[in-house]
Amino acid sequence: MATFKLEVVTPLKKVLDRDAEMVIMRTIEGDMGVMADHAPFVAELAVGEMKIKSANGEEAYFVSGGFLEISKEKTMILADEAIDVKEIDVERAKREAEIAKETLVKLKEDKDIAVTQKSLQEALTKVRIAEQYMHHL
């Protein structure tokens, strides 16, 4: 299968820089798959799972939003956060979800509610993705 250069970058580090056969991620308009020779494209990423398929098999990452840019040279994912599913601390993510739920009950400001809802969504997504992959190992 044909490959393309994939880069995944967060504000803190370069997470990946290698060849891939396909990457599937969630954009704000729905799930999207990218393969070699995809047309140039830009999209906003949503909180969700990113699956990468290569000759070495399949990997999964948690992505907390950001942007996708597809060009002739490469596919770049500029993520707020990107964590290999194997590195997710499920118990910590569950605690983060509980804290966010408790905080939501107390909030009055719309902007605070939106930020806390995103934190809750991120924590619950981490738990879902990590638990899903633990059962497949």
UniProtKB/Swiss-Prot annotation:
One Pfam family cited in the UniProt record for this chain: ATP-synt_DE
- Using the UniProt record, give the first listed, main subcellular location: membrane
An example GO biological process term is: sodium ion transport
GO-annotated molecular function: ATP binding; proton-transporting ATP synthase activity, rotational mechanism
- Note on file? The ATPase of P.modestum is of special interest because it uses sodium ions instead of protons as the physiological coupling ion.
Which Gene Ontology terms of cellular component type are present?
Answer: plasma membrane; proton-transporting ATP synthase complex
Subunit-structure text:
F-type ATPases have 2 components, CF(1) - the catalytic core - and CF(0) - the membrane proton channel. CF(1) has five subunits: alpha(3), beta(3), gamma(1), delta(1), epsilon(1). CF(0) has three main subunits: a, b and c.
State the similarity comment.
Belongs to the ATPase epsilon chain family.
Q: Which domain of life is it from?
A: Bacteria
Alphabetically sorted, this entry's keywords are: ATP synthesis, Cell inner membrane, Cell membrane, CF(1), Ion transport, Membrane, Sodium, Sodium transport, Transport
What does this chain do? Produces ATP from ADP in the presence of a sodium gradient across the membrane.
Q: Which Gene3D superfamilies does UniProt cross-reference here?
A: F0F1 ATP synthase delta/epsilon subunit, N-terminal
Protein name, UniProt field: ATP synthase epsilon chain, sodium ion specific
Q: Which SUPFAM superfamilies match?
A: Epsilon subunit of F1F0-ATP synthase N-terminal domain (SSF51344)
Q: How does it sit in the membrane?
A: Peripheral membrane protein
Decide whether keyword Cytoplasm is in the record: no
What organism is listed for this UniProt entry? Propionigenium modestum
Kindly list the places in or outside the cell where this protein is found, as annotated in its UniProt entry: Cell inner membrane
